[in-house]
Amino acid sequence: MTEISSMVISHKKAKIEEMESAWHGDLDGLLHNLYNHEYIHECVVLKTCNRVEIYVVSPSSSILFSFAKEMGASTHIIDFYGHDESLEHLLRLAGGLESMIVGEDQILGQIKELYAYSKKAGTTGKILDTAFDKAIQVGKRIRNETRINKGSVSIGSAAVDLAEEILDGLAGKSVLVIGAGEIGVLVAKALAAKDIEAIYIANRTFKKAEELAYELGGYAVKLNDVQTQLKNADVVISGTGAPHYILTREIVEKAIEERDKTRKLLLIDIANPRDIEESVAELDNVKLCNIDNLRVISEKTLKMRKEEAKKAEAIIQEEIKLLNLQYKRQRADKIISDLYKQIYDVRIREREKAVNRLCAYHTIGKIETDVLDDLTHSIANKILAEPTKVLRQAAELGNDEFLDVAARIFCLEKDKVKAEKIKSDCGIKVEKMKPDCESATDRVSEKGN
């Protein structure tokens, strides 16, 4: 049976450098590499600063092991999930329960965006569409019905909380935010609520920096002028999507030389890949923090939200049951649809044969052909009515064996053959072979001639 499987690399097992080294490629390349695989029917890739997750639909549940090897990721930082585990994880993820900052809103937006990206690329289908539509719906419901997203609930706001904790408050401090994308906006808005002296926004696209700075009463800075701004900043929080360092050791070192020697500089890097070169931490009067340092803030937030998390868990378990029922109905609907198509193909062929035989004796008009059409249509529907009812009941009861047998009897599903081929390719003994269904209906109709 074709089902969802997934592989997850996240902050729970991997450090920031391990997540960076797990995947260096672009999203398009990975999506198409997955989708072009013979045994993968659908795929979605989620890549954020805290995780790399791959969801595929395949008759082989072990298909992602080979991709993990290709990525060069160490297996000790990867979780591999089967169908049921993948669904539960995805709903938990959308609900904010898998985030470093439990209940954060940002992850739901990222899921929407990355799912839409895969959908536009043409790599999704009915199975993943159903899962991701449900996940997005559940994420919204959890935030509407619980208080899990109240307070400091994003990487951006957690970075600001970390700066406050390290500096014993931000009052009178000058803060430079590098990046005016989603993370940068979250950081800047969290800072705007603090009693800081000034906020500076630097971005590759200067217009975006100007717009955000204007909204928050700050100052826009061109990315090329960041080194100059470092001379005056107390805190720098960087969260761009750049594939290279924004602040190299050389840039920071030059800025430090022009600063008051007793003045310390706090750098917080919340980008993945990282924006700030690691060796910057070796410089005098510089403290460098990254995503791993946010775990302390995350743990404090988690304690405050345990009760809300319990409510979210209850919603997820309720929605998982509904999602599984939806999949069961879809399985029956697919078999029923294929069965109707098969019977209707026979109906059309036999109707044409009947018309041709009648035409051999005398001319027939539209009335006669309409009667034949109605007759064969009615017979087909009456024959299929009871099987349709029974198949839907079996699906709702979770009787997969019954559905499998029905599909085999009528030669409807090809995934079983494909799964057996995969096992055969892997050297696994295949004891059961699918009967030859080629032109089975033709043989039935030929026998009736």
UniProtKB/Swiss-Prot annotation:
Keyword NADP: yes
Record lineage: Archaea, Methanobacteriati, Methanobacteriota, Stenosarchaea group, Methanomicrobia
InterPro entries from the UniProt entry: 4pyrrol_synth_GluRdtase (IPR000343), 4pyrrol_synth_GluRdtase_dimer (IPR015896), 4pyrrol_synth_GluRdtase_N (IPR015895), GluRdtase_CS (IPR018214), GluRdtase_dimer_dom_sf (IPR036453), GluRdtase_N_sf (IPR036343), NAD(P)-bd_dom_sf (IPR036291), Shikm_DH/Glu-tRNA_Rdtase (IPR006151)
Pathway(s): Porphyrin-containing compound metabolism; protoporphyrin-IX biosynthesis; 5-aminolevulinate from L-glutamyl-tRNA(Glu): step 1/2
Residues engaged in binding substrate: T48, C49, N50, R51, S99, E104, D105, Q106, Q110
Record note on domains: Possesses an unusual extended V-shaped dimeric structure with each monomer consisting of three distinct domains arranged along a curved 'spinal' alpha-helix. The N-terminal catalytic domain specifically recognizes the glutamate moiety of the substrate. The second domain is the NADPH-binding domain, and the third C-terminal domain is responsible for dimerization.
Pfam families: GlutR_dimer, GlutR_N, Shikimate_DH
Source species of the chain: Methanosarcina barkeri (strain Fusaro / DSM 804)
Domain of life (superkingdom): Archaea
Active site: C49
Keywords: NADP, Oxidoreductase, Porphyrin biosynthesis
Name this protein carries in UniProt: Glutamyl-tRNA reductase
Reaction equation(s) it catalyzes: (S)-4-amino-5-oxopentanoate + tRNA(Glu) + NADP(+) = L-glutamyl-tRNA(Glu) + NADPH + H(+)
